[in-house]
Amino acid sequence: LVFEPYAYEALKTANEKILGIEGLPAYHMDKADVLVSLGADFLETWLSPVEYARKFKAMHALNRGRKGFFCHISAYQSLTGANADLWLSCKPGTEAHVAMGLVHQAITSGRGKNLPESLLSSIKQVSLPFTKEAVVLASGISAENFDRTATRLTTAKKPLIVGPGSACGNALQTNMAVNLLNLIFDPQLMLFDFEGRHRVETAARRSQVLAFFERLNQEPVDLLLLNNTNPVFSMPWESTVIEALKQKRLFVVSFSSFMDETTALADLVIPTRLPLETWDEYSGRRGMVSTLQPAMGHLTEAPSIGDVFLCSNGGKKPDNYTKYLYRHLKQKKKFETTKAWAQTIQQGGIFKQNHRTPSFQPPEIEPVFFHKAFDNLLLPSTSELAFMAVPSIRFFDGRGANRPWLCEVPDPLTKIAWQTPVLMHPQTMKTKGFAQEDMVEIQSETGRLNAPVYETEGVHPGIIVMAIGQGHQNFG
C-alpha cells in the first residue's frame, strides 16, 4: 500500500469521470499562452513543483515582445498566487462555481463546437445556472475581473486550466469543471501529456488506507512493515490507525531515521540510510528514471532498506542492493551495457521526452452525471469565520518539520521563521478586535492550538488560514 497524504484523489477522480483516465497526466504548461489556476499551487506543493516552476518560467517569459498571462483564483494568496498577473480572491469552496461560470461564458461565446454534439449539449445544459451574476454573487469576485479572465481564455490560442490538488470544498467538481474547460478550448488536449503521468497517481485513496487499518484491527495479521511514513500524524484523529498499531498480536517494524508519531508506536525501529547515502532509483514520471548514489558517503552504520530486504531473502543472489538495482534496471531494458549504466549514473538518470497520444477522444458521458455533479454544488460556509489548513511550502504535510534549517528559513510571503502564524484579513481582524501578533486559540472537536495573528490582504475576508506541518508530538 502506497500512503501519500496528498494523494490528489479529487483530481484523479475528475480525470476518470471526464477524461476516462484514472491517473495524473502531466501538463505542457510551458506551451500555454494563457494559464488559469483554480487553487493549484504548482510553485509549492502541487504534483511536481520543480518541473512546473521551470515550465511556468518559460510560459511567463518575454518572447518576441509577448509573454503568457497567468490568473490564479483561490481563497488565499499562496506563493503561486503572488506570482500571478491577476489574483482573484474567492470565497473558499467556490472555485467550482467560478470554473462553471467560465464554462458558461466559453460556450456562450461559441467555443466548444468541435466537441461531440451530445457532450456539448450536456455541458451547455448543466452550465446554464452559472451566469456571471450568479458566479459573482456566490464567489465574491468582481464582475470586471470575471469578465477579464473569461475574455483572456476565449481569445487565447493555447489556454490551459489547472485545478486544486489538496482536498477542499467542491474539489472534485472544480477539477471536473477544469477538465471540461480544457476540452472546450482544445478537444484534443494537446497540452496534456498522458504518457508521462506522475508517479504519485499510484498512491492509495484515503478510503483504502482507512480500510487497510480497519482490517489490521479485525484480521489476524502478525507483522506490519512501515517505510518512512507517518500515518498517525497525517490521518484524521478519528481513524483507527493508533488502535491498529497498538494491537498486541501485531508486530510493527518502522524503517525510519527519525522518531515520529508512528515510529514511537513501533515494536522495532530500524534506521535506514538517507537518500544521499545509498544507491537507488526513482521514477517521478512514466518513462523517466532518476538515479540516486551515495554522494555523502555513509554518515552512520545504518543499512539501506534494500539491503535489509535482501538479507531476509535467505542469502539468494544478488548479495547487495547495488547489484540488485543494476540487474533490475537492465532487466527492464533501461540500458544494455555496463558503459550505458555508467552514462546513466553520470547524467543522474534516463530522461526521454514523452509524447502524448494524438488520438485522444472525449469519452461518452451521460447527461444525468453532469446534473448529479453540478446541480447541488455546496455553497460557501455561512459561519462567521471559516478555517483553512493548507499545504506548507516549508514542511509540506509536516514531514519536514523536524529539520531545523526548514524551520529557520523564513516563509517566502510572511517572512516569518520558526513558527506558523494564523493569516487573517484586516477586515476580519477589525471585526474581531484582533491586532498584529495577538495570540488566538483555534478549537475544534478534535483539539485546539494557539498561534499568533498575521495581518495580510492575501486571504479572503471571513476566513483564517494556517499552514500544515508543525504541531508534532514526536518528531526528533
Predicted features and spans:
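Non-catalytic, well-ordered alpha-helical segments in soluble enzyme domains
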Residues: 304-328
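A polyampholytic, Gly/Pro-enriched intrinsically disordered region
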Residues: 16-33, 90-95, 109, 207-220, ...
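Residues on a specific face of well-ordered alpha-helices
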Residues: 9, 54, 82, 96-105, ...
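Long, well-ordered, tryptophan-enriched scaffold segments
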Residues: 29-39, 43-50, 58, 62-160, ...
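A cross-kingdom feature strongest in bacterial/archaeal respiratory oxidoreductases
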Residues: 4, 37-40, 45-83, 197, ...
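Anionic-ligand anchoring segments at beta-strand to alpha-helix junctions in alpha/beta enzyme folds, i.e.
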Residues: 1-24, 176-206
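Short acidic (Asp/Glu) and glycine-rich catalytic loops that position anionic groups and cofactors
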Residues: 77-83, 126-131, 155-162, 189-193, ...
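Conserved short loop/turn motifs at secondary-structure junctions
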Residues: 137-141, 163-170, 197-201, 228-233
